[in-house]
Amino acid sequence: MTSPALKDPAKTRVIVGMSGGVDSSVSALLLIEQGYQVEGLFMKNWEEDDGTEYCTAREDLADAQAVCDRIGIKLHTANFAAEYWDNVFEHFLEEYKAGRTPNPDILCNREIKFKAFLDYALSLGADLIATGHYVRRRDTGALTELLKGLDPNKDQSYFLHAVGGQEIARTLFPVGELEKPEVRAIAEKHGLATAKKKDSTGICFIGERRFSDFLKQYLPAQPGDIETTEGEVIGRHHGLMYHTIGQRQGLGIGGLKDASDEPWYVLHKDLARNVLVVGQGNEHPWLFSRALLASEIFWVNPVDLGSPRQLTAKVRYRQSDQRCTLERTASGYRAVFDEPQRAVTPGQSVVFYDGEVCLGGGVIEAAEPWSPRA
């Protein structure tokens, strides 16, 4: 199968997902310079935008429109709020109810940006879509591989690991070959309104609000005890859903008579007893795992795992590649690491790589401790 990207650019219509940020702005500009027929599309994925603390959807739309006006392309708008609620947000809440720490950006990419947006763009007559993600693609015969972005500080393949090769084949990633300072320099050179705009951080539907304040609107908090690894109760938590493995801030522990001055960290969430288990020190043994279990793994392209395979993995965004052996089990997958892994967190994603190729990944179900626990 010939990849759509191999067509003559002058005869190829590309719709760029315009977020109102500098990366998508420069992506559209670069595609114009490469000779593509370019249009933009701004997605609204969340309805509640009347509060000043919510992420600035109106400002983002205005910035996207200003950029499109500047470079001379049409901007479409689409509302995917219903799809986002059904396919991303409800799953996000269910995971927190189950005491896990989900990553909604990964589902958003799979269900919204590379499904709802892609389908909508194709219905408008597009041949391809494009986004401002820092990743690359490589066409190898009938398959299209997902590669890391060249800028190691901005590589976003971790967040795109659940997007299939067929969708990657329909997508261009113009800034994936660039480093962030180069992208900003291009935007400044061409007078784009987003040239100096700060990168968005956090989960879009939460914006600048405190996470705990947002979450309690949707889920009832269940306070419980905070215990040491020896079972001593040393405080109360407001709800396990507000805490994640390895967390240091916001525990409200201090001034204990027999404790050292070392900071406290979340080591474990005992869901059955609604207890938060904590310990002192950044290097506490309970923070480290030798292996993890993952349920279903989503592969970008088919992967043969008939026997254990040496790969690298990331258990969080921006982590350096960690050597591991991945094997099938009766109930899913098990990754055994060469080195101890800190704060492996159920609900987060583990993503596997073969060199620069992102193979895919899955949700972490459980971690196996590096050393035995009493």
UniProtKB/Swiss-Prot annotation:
Subcellular location: Cytoplasm
CDD domains found in the cross-reference section: MnmA_TRMU-like (cd01998)
Region annotation (Interaction with target base in tRNA) ranges: 103-105
Catalysed transformations (reactions): S-sulfanyl-L-cysteinyl-[protein] + uridine(34) in tRNA + AH2 + ATP = 2-thiouridine(34) in tRNA + L-cysteinyl-[protein] + A + AMP + diphosphate + H(+)
Keyword tRNA processing: yes
Residues that coordinate or bind ATP: 17-24, 43, 132
SS bonds (residue pairs): 108-204
Active site: 108, 204
GO terms under biological process: tRNA wobble position uridine thiolation
Domain of life where this protein originates: Bacteria
The entry's keywords: ATP-binding, Cytoplasm, Disulfide bond, Nucleotide-binding, RNA-binding, Transferase, tRNA processing, tRNA-binding
Location of the region described as Interaction with tRNA in the Swiss-Prot/TrEMBL record: 154-156, 316-317
Transmembrane segments: none
Site feature Interaction with tRNA, where: 133, 348
Enzyme Commission (EC) number: 2.8.1.13
GO MF annotations, alphabetized: ATP binding; tRNA binding; tRNA-uridine 2-sulfurtransferase activity
Homology family: Belongs to the MnmA/TRMU family.
Cited HAMAP family: tRNA_thiouridyl_MnmA (MF_00144)
Protein name (record): tRNA-specific 2-thiouridylase MnmA
Source organism per UniProt: Pseudomonas putida (strain ATCC 47054 / DSM 6125 / CFBP 8728 / NCIMB 11950 / KT2440)
Gene name for this UniProt entry: mnmA
